[in-house]
Amino acid sequence: MSSSAPAVDAAQVSPGESYSTGRRVLILVMVVLGSTLYATTLLIASTLLPQMQGAMSATQDEIAWAMTFNILATAVATPMTGWLAARFGRRETMMWSVFAFTVTTFMCGAAESLETLILWRVLQGALGAPVIPLSQTILLDSFPKRQAGFVTSIFGMAVVIGPVIGPTVGGMLSELYGWRWAFYMIVPVGMVSFIGLRLTLPRDAPTGRVALDWTGFLSLSVTIACVQLVLSRGQRLDWFESREIVVETFVAALAFWVFIAHSLTASRPFLNLRLLLDRKYAIGLTLVLIYGMVNFTPMVLLPPLLQQHAGFPDQLIGEIIAARGVGATIGFFLAIFVGRIDPRVGLVGGFTLQALSGWWLMGIDLNVDTGTLMANSLVQGVAIGVIWVPLTLVTFSNVAPANLAEGMAVYHLLRNIGSSFFISLSIAEIVRTTGANYSRMTEFLNPTTGRWRCRG
């Protein structure tokens, strides 16, 4: 019995304990650069939606697919991170994922139609999906456990500030040179990241020819895709009055049942649901789902509203979103301080701030001033910064290093699902209320309306 104890202890030791400080810093810089770039591409289209909508002759909900389908593809492909890392090694998977999303980002800028743009955005999300979970796994393994809070804060800034940099710089470039250059700007930095990762990441041997559980992967993918289609097209097709929506709902339910049944009975399932037996991990997954729902939605909905109805230029919209990045930076430093007291304080405080910022936005109208929007964006940033660090540390506090890659993949899967589904629901609600408001307004229009206005 005593002989097994050292093996357990060894499994809990990070490989990075033996790395020099200089090597850790280089790994940190290159990994954070790659994850920042990928996070930048997630929402880079948010300030570009109005321009792309005109260029592609698309409706509001159609052009939003360029956002939601990218996040959906990321969500579907993220769970494959564990298998890819085991099959090809973390270094190779991380490096070539950065290269792939760099190439697909260039192709997004070169797209000439809505269909091609959505195709390349889907490939961009799917091929780059391993970057975020692998980045966090590599960093946590490269640093001693006592520095986990610091590393998580730095990585969190990359994940949160990346989506802020994209719309901000993208808005400026689109106003000066057109929306395509917001995508093109990623390419040279992406190639630098690819070369840097190749030079700095330590080589790791694949664990062998691990068989992919195709039943689990396909059933999960079909479930997510069908639910996303229901949410994206439901309002346009009048929900369950449409045969398509009914069929997609039935297929989603059936595929989800297959996924759960198979995962609980297979010897090596695609996702190990037994990780959910860890109470902290299960609670963390629930909270990160909510975090994903409230994190990206304002950044998708506000830019079209401000540009189309309030007449804000792209550059000013980018500056408003940039305030969110400033708030996030403040939030991360606050999270480190609060975490020394009790992580639960950070979680409660962060989600409370997020709720207050949403309540604040409920009261704005088209006469809102820039200062109010920037202040609200700043509060949102502080909230997401304060939440991220304690949420990540608490979720993975009991997860063994051997399960870290798979656990991280599920964590980011639920974060992306929360974002994608809630964005689609929000846009469906906007389309519904817009139609209802239009109907009410037309009730007061008749042939005499213009005559009375002229006489007045």
Question: What is each residue range found by the language model?
Answer:
Residues M1-A39:
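Cytosolic juxtamembrane N-terminal segment immediately preceding the first transmembrane helix
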Residues S3, D9, E17, V410, ...:
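Hydrophobic transmembrane architecture of multi-pass small-molecule transporters
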Residues R24-T41, A45-L49, M56-A73, G82, ...:
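12-transmembrane solute porter fold
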Residues T47, I71, T78-G216:
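Helix-loop-helix hairpins in multi-pass membrane proteins, especially solute transporters
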